[in-house]
Regions:
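Catalytic-core domains of enzymes
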Residues: 1-107
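Flexible loop/turn segments at secondary-structure boundaries
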Residues: 2-5, 65-67, 97-99, 117-120, ...
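Residue-level detector of buried hydrophobic side-chain packing
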Residues: 3, 59, 81, 110, ...
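Caspase-like cysteine protease fold
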Residues: 4-6, 24, 28-30, 35-37, ...
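Catalytic cores of nucleophile-dependent amide-cleaving enzymes
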Residues: 35-42, 46, 108-198
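Soluble non-cytosolic domains of exported or imported proteins
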Residues: 68-76, 94, 163-167, 194-198, ...
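Stable alpha-helical elements in mature extracytoplasmic
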Residues: 74-77, 81, 96, 100, ...
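Acidic/polar loop patches that form or flank catalytic/metal-binding clefts of enzymes
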Residues: 88-92, 185-186, 213-217
Length: 281
């Protein structure tokens, strides 16, 4: 059962005697991976055609009074991502449960950088993700409504859950998928904040370039390995993030600045009118 949390990309394609994590022949050098909860869910996720471009919403909550560490690096990265993709940005107290529930219904890409937790037992009220005003647990997720195409959860253990016979991994992925979320980027363990921020920024860049979700994540991880020191090349730092669900590309929409077009078109139209009038005269 524990193998369900093992990313296939960390397996080796051949025997190796090296102890240097950077030089090991991981499968990620040859293949990209995405995961499915079940064949029926996969079929459901692929039935409805979605728009290629989608607006993004980014969440970065603060945690006053919740006995949690503030994720300062995540906040900086979240703001940079929001600026890059002209996304709606909810930070600190604005990144609350109500705002998240509303965003789920607006057919957007959602990036959430927060604290998450899970336990390998059946206490679903202890599995979930933190917002500025509280904790959204697994049972509560089943009661939400969603039109979300892609949910990026940059938080610990969001892909981890208890095992039930005949049901598999009872995780946030299962809950969000059941309410209509088409695909997710989730964490299989307690992830490192710095490496997660590097990976998600790079992942979104490749997603914008047109790669599928698993291809974009593969490229982000390979870039990370190329620039890592021997310690950070350990799979703990890069293999925890994985794609679950629909693997098709979806580009975060970058809003055009239409003001520049207006400033260009009006003088041009005026010049054309003046030129035609001059010719008539």
């Amino acid at each position: 059962a524990e193998l369900s949390n093992l990313p296939f990309e960390t397996l080796l394609s051949e025997n190796s005697k090296t102890n240097d994590f950077r030089k090991l022949p991981y499968l990620i050098h040859k293949y990209n991976f995405s995961y499915s909860l079940s064949s029926s869910i996969t079929k459901l996720n692929n039935t409805k055609r979605r728009k290629l471009f989608e607006r993004m919403t980014v969440f970065s909550p603060s945690f006053e009074g919740q006995n949690l560490t503030q994720l300062q690096l995540s906040k900086v990265t979240a703001k940079a991502i929001a600026n890059e993709f002209k996304a709606s940005f909810f930070e600190n107290k604005e990144a609350n449960l109500k705002a998240f529930k509303n965003a789920l219904q607006e057919n957007k890409i959602i990036s959430m950088f927060s604290h998450g937790q899970s336990f390998n037992d059946f206490e679903n009220n202890k599995k979930g993700i933190y917002f500025s005003d509280g904790f959204l647990n697994l049972n509560e997720i089943y009661n939400l409504k969603s039109n979300c195409d892609f949910l990026l959860l940059g938080a610990c253990e969001t892909g981890l859950g208890g095992k039930e016979r005949g049901e598999g991994n009872i995780s946030l992925a299962r809950a969000f998928s059941s309410i209509g979320v088409k695909s997710m980027l989730l964490a299989s363990w307690k992830i490192d904040e710095e490496s997660t921020m590097k990976l998600t920024e790079s992942f979104l860049k490749y997603l914008q370039e047109g790669y599928s979700k698993s291809e974009a994540l593969q490229k982000a991880k390979l870039d990370f390995l190329k620039t890592s020191n021997p310690r950070n090349a350990n799979p703990f730092y890069w293999a925890g993030l994985n794609i679950v669900g629909n693997n098709k590309n979806i580009k975060p929409h970058q809003t055009q600045n239409y003001l520049w077009w207006i400033l260009l078109i009006f003088p041009l139209a005026g010049w054309v009118w003046y030129y035609k009038r001059k010719r008539v005269n």
